[in-house]
Regions:
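A small/polar (G/S/T-enriched), proline-flanked helix-loop surface module common
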Residues: 22-147
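Short basic (Lys/Arg) and small-residue
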Residues: 11
Length: 202
């Protein structure tokens, strides 16, 4: 039976390079913007998944987790490796793929009563793993003082054999898609190497 350490399966700040560092805690925009609701069940499920950093539901236990900060652009990236049933993963990938059509644009209301105009688009991912889906979600609103706000979230899910990678990457400033793609590419390579080697790490 193959066993691997969480470190072996995960990615690190070094994989993404400067300015990424280990996280200093949850960003304030998570509660201020992502804790929101809307009428459509599919769109509400998306908001809930983004808020919880959980694309696959509470039953999905993460074997490896990396949480990283980009202090320069005030962005955060969360990378998870999960052991899930392939059919369940494919159903979630199909749901994610449908969202640019079913939730392309919609309005959400935060816990503080602020209105967010949400846009969901498909995002390109590396041709890595057995199946994959990426999204870019943009939430536009205003501060209580009337200043415009924009929260951008990249979402990526990739099935790699019996493993699944989930990445969320967001912030109120620039959110570079290259970092999302690098996390996916590095993660798939790492899992593939571990599976090929079949070695046990303790």
């Amino acid at each position: 039976i193959r066993a691997v350490t969480r470190t072996a399966e995960s990615i690190t700040a070094g994989d993404l390079g400067d300015p990424w560092t280990p996280t200093q805690g949850a960003a304030t925009w998570r509660d201020g913007v992502l804790k929101a609701t809307t009428d459509s069940p599919d769109c509400r499920r998306l908001l809930d998944a983004l808020y919880a950093d959980d694309l696959f539901g509470a039953s999905g236990g993460a074997r490896a987790v990396a949480a990283l900060d980009d202090a320069m652009d005030q962005a955060q990236l969360r990378y998870q490796v999960l052991a899930l049933n392939a059919a369940d993963v494919d159903r979630t990938l199909a749901w994610l793929q449908s969202l640019p059509r079913t939730c392309g644009t919609f309005t959400a209301v935060t816990a503080h009563g602020a209105v967010q105009n949400v846009e969901v688009k498909e995002a390109d991912l590396p041709q890595a793993g057995d199946a994959r889906q990426g999204l870019r979600v943009t939430l536009r609103g205003q501060t209580p003082d009337g200043d415009p706000t924009v929260l951008t979230m990249d979402v990526a899910a990739v099935r790699v054999g019996g493993d699944t990678i989930a990445v969320t990457h967001g912030g109120m400033g620039d959110v570079w898609a290259d970092a999302t793609r690098a996390a996916v590419q590095t993660g798939v390579q790492r899992l593939s190497e571990i599976r090929r080697s079949g070695r046990v790490e303790v």
